Amino acid sequence: MAAITASMVAELRAKTDAPMMECKKALTEADGDMARAEELLRVKLGNKASKAASRVTAEGVIASFIEGGAGAIVELNCETDFVSKNDDFIGFSKKVAELVVKQNPADVGALSALALDGSTVDAVRSALVGKIGENLSIRRFARFETSNKLAAYLHGTRIGVLVEYTGADEQVGKDVAMHIAAMKPVSLSSDDVPADLIAKERSIAEQKAAESGKPAEIVAKMVDGSVQKYLKEVSLLNQPFVKNDKQTIEQMLKAANASVQNFALFVVGEGIEKRQDDFAAEVAAQVAAAKQQ
């Protein structure tokens, strides 16, 4: 049996970026053969990535990048809040955001196939899964390319906003982006609110109004009033500005001789159903599995 030295472990780690203990195990199994140990690790890390792929990723980060007339925000997901703070994961997210801006992929599939660090985005992601031990995924991105101005705002790493706007004052773009992160509008104007959201709100309003016992014509007016109120609350231009609630966003923009053409808002894990673990059941399952080995 060949002696496994610290320098051999360090060399293998430098080549594969795998955890130190995994490197030592691979070298031991390969009887000190560096090439064989590297091959064993590649297989093992690949298996880790495959096993992790079925696990729910509802935590994660938002990253942004703007260059010239193009900008993007991207959402990458992981399984735990702990890993969302991992430097390698955050660094990867920033590289992905930059690629979206510079390469303009059509979708996440095309993005995953782009070249990165001598490999592909998906291969780098898969290697990171093996290193960290959690499922990691690129969920979505938004990219704007325009002759207008762009502003991005990140609230920590969990909320990201990209805004396309006009106007001489760059602070306007920053203020609008921050407002969107805080107030989370669903559309630019009331005319742009998705029909399914309006239908849902109308249904709720109808149920509430019907319980009032008032005449049908009064109920109809109550429903219309509730829907109109909702439209104002969720459309950006109609919302009171967070830094001065005596003005709406539309009024603030008009005073600054500015306008907003488009925006994208991402909130980490939004719409993803998180896994609810039964800890006692999980431990029992692990004990049972251990007994069968």
Curated annotation (Swiss-Prot):
Q: Where is the signal peptide?
A: none
Q: Which Gene Ontology cellular component terms are annotated?
A: cytoplasm
Pfam families registered for this protein in UniProt? EF_TS (PF00889)
Q: Which domain of life is it from?
A: Bacteria
Coiled coil ranges: none
Q: Does the keyword Zinc apply?
A: no
Q: What family is this?
A: Belongs to the EF-Ts family.
Q: What does this protein do?
A: Associates with the EF-Tu.GDP complex and induces the exchange of GDP to GTP. It remains bound to the aminoacyl-tRNA.EF-Tu.GTP complex up to the GTP hydrolysis stage on the ribosome.
Which residues does the annotated region (Involved in Mg(2+) ion dislocation from EF-Tu) include? 80-83
Q: Which gene encodes it?
A: tsf
The name on file for this protein is: Elongation factor Ts
Q: What is its main location?
A: cytoplasm
List keywords of the entry alphabetically: Cytoplasm, Elongation factor, Protein biosynthesis
Gene Ontology MF terms in the entry: translation elongation factor activity
Subcellular locations according to the entry: Cytoplasm
Organism classification = Bacteria, Pseudomonadati, Pseudomonadota, Betaproteobacteria, Burkholderiales
What HAMAP family does this protein's entry cite? EF_Ts (MF_00050)
Q: Which CDD domains match?
A: UBA_EF-Ts
